[in-house]
Design a protein with these regions (language model features):
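Active-site/acyl-donor-binding loops of N-acyltransferases
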Residues: 2, 117-198, 249-252, 259, ...
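A conserved beta-strand-loop-helix scaffold within acyl/acetyltransferase catalytic domains
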Residues: 5-92, 210-297
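A general structural signal for short secondary-structure junctions and capping/turn motifs
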Residues: 50, 109-112, 252-253, 317-319
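Conserved acetyl-CoA-binding loop-helix of GNAT-fold acetyltransferases
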Residues: 94-113, 304-316
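Charge-rich interaction segments
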Residues: 172-233
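Short, amphipathic alpha-helical segments
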Residues: 83, 101-105, 121-125
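Mid-sequence acidic-hydrophobic segments that form the walls
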Residues: 73, 92-95, 110-124, 133-134
């Protein structure tokens, strides 16, 4: 006889079941009841928006066994006028033996009982489809931008057959096949490097008088909050970039995972970029290429030179670590031209923004181009 399905919010009483689930999916092979309790309590204590309040985590049980889990991350969303408490929906896990049925639907449906204003940034088709089926709005894919650094190496390693399967024209894929020849690859690198230098020249002029710093710690709270106030004045929709958020997101428990490039106009902070080394070097999709990321980018709208200054600093950082390329995921239409002028190539995105605003009462923009969104949002800084 089939065992009953039960979806509900998880808490400390479920620590044993959560630990068993985490060991099974390989997220933490050493998970114990005690480690889960520490995780739940620490997550609540470190909540920068509602200290002491744990964000909802829900699960689906088959009988007494936890077979699916979905977590959330607290945030605040800006609508151009005010901030509202919200959650990122993140971490959609279903045990392999229980996929393909109603469990995913029940899992997300249960989560939506415990959150109001919410958003997610999934790449996989299934959670996107379930989200739309349950009333969330898919605003589309967030565009990727790639800055090639070691061009000859990229050309020689790129999989032209895979590109062909992903919609690259036959002529382009044939050209890329020939570009694998070393002499042609290095000649192409020289030509592309010269073209990028010419593209960047006007931006370099705009950046005169600005200074940049590369550090392992964020600037001070007052400077960060001042930059955030200026940034949001021209943005219609985004997640918060307050000092409290940035410290919680990129410093607390990050163990040096991120590097920070700050841009200054005299004593005033006019821009911040957050960079990250690749999490793994064995991803078969990357053909052995080492790709760093600019996971967040915050800019003073009164200083157009800040973006080029920060991207120069990010480029130097990436070259010092022998990265083959830099990836930046950015939704904001107004940054497309500056990014192209900085030598970034626009690519189709794989991460979608999905929003839930019950009754549309918060007035968030339905136009993805008007959002300020990066991979740093929703903890999506992975390839």
């Amino acid at each position: 006889m089939p065992q009953p399905l039960k979806a509900r919010r998880l808490g400390e009483a479920d620590a044993d079941a959560i630990a068993d689930f985490m060991r099974t999916i390989g997220q933490d092979v050493d998970a114990t009841r005690e480690s889960v309790l520490r995780w739940l309590r620490t997550t609540a204590a470190q909540n920068p928006f509602q200290p002491g309040v744990g964000p909802p985590t829900v699960g689906v049980f088959v009988g007494s066994k936890l077979v699916a889990c979905l977590t959330s991350i607290p945030t605040r969303l800006w609508n151009g006028t005010e901030l509202a408490d919200a959650h990122w929906i993140k971490g959609f896990w279903v045990l392999e033996d229980h996929r393909g049925g109603l469990i995913g639907y029940l899992l997300l449906k249960e989560m939506l009982k415990h959150v109001g204003l919410a958003a997610s940034m999934p790449a996989a088709l299934e959670p996107r489809g379930l989200s739309v089926a349950l009333g969330m709005r898919d605003l589309g894919a967030v565009r990727n931008y790639i800055e090639p650094l070691r061009i000859a190496r990229i050309l020689r390693r790129i999989d032209w057959q895979l590109l062909k399967l992903n919609g690259v024209s036959k002529r382009a894929s044939i050209a890329l096949k020939f570009a694998k020849i070393p002499l042609i690859a290095y000649a192409a690198q020289g030509l592309i490097t010269v073209c990028f230098a010419a593209l960047r020249f006007p931006s370099a002029l705009a950046a005169r008088g600005l200074t940049t710093q590369l550090q392992e710690r964020l600037p001070n709270e007052a400077d960060l909050d001042s930059l955030w106030a200026r940034t949001r004045s021209v943005v219609s929709s985004c997640a918060t970039r307050s000092a409290a958020y940035l410290q919680w997101r990129y410093e607390l428990g990050a163990n040096g995972r991120y590097q920070f490039a700050s841009c200054w106009r005299g004593p005033e902070l006019v821009g911040l970029a957050v960079m990250q080394n690749p999490e793994r070097l064995d991803d078969p999709r990357l053909a052995g290429l080492v790709i760093g990321s600019v996971v967040d980018l915050i800019l003073d709208p009164s200083c157009p030179g800040a973006v080029s200054s920060l991207l120069v600093a990010a480029r130097r950082w990436a070259r010092s670590r022998n990265h083959d390329a830099l990836l930046l995921t950015m939704s904001q239409r107004g940054l497309r031209v500056p990014l192209l002028r900085a030598g970034y190539i626009s690519m189709p995105g794989n991460i979608h923004l999905i929003v839930r605003d019950p009754g549309d009462k918060h007035g968030l923009s339905p136009n993805l181009d008007e959002w300020l969104l990066t991979r740093g949002d929703s903890w999506s800084d992975h390839l």
